[in-house]
Amino acid sequence: ARAMEELDQRGEAYNREIPVGIMIETPAAVMLSDILACHVDFFSIGSNDLIQYTTASDRMNERVQYLYDSCNLSVLRSIKLVCDNARARKVDVGICGETASEPRLIPLWCAMGINELSVAPALAGRTKYIINQTSKADLEPVMDAILAQGSVPAARERLDQILRELGL
């Protein structure tokens, strides 16, 4: 939005219909996502940073690396909150980072209503295949059960069970 204001001030022509979005990479952005959704067309969830900041971990530091877990319930619930707030304002949600192409999480992303997964080209075929095997309507009730799990291992096992049930 600020860039558009600057272009307007300089009298430069540009596409006024270009979608404006923001990255959701911190717990603070998650908590404000209901307010932020009023000002944008889309969210892009930066999963690598969100996991790191939510779990107080560092993927590159071997002393705390073990805390970095894509199936951490705080992370999954945070992403669900962002999706719910976005849906309430008709804001699209994408996710980037390693979790976007993590097989056990792809059905969960579909159930949450994530519109776009940003994945490495080498993983696009597998990711598309998993998406095509996934039914959002069938997985929405399962998603709530996963997010209500009492432990990360239990959530991970349920996610893996979904993949097995899908024949993946």
Question: PLM features: residue spans?
Answer:
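Conserved alpha/beta-domain cores
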Residues: 1-168
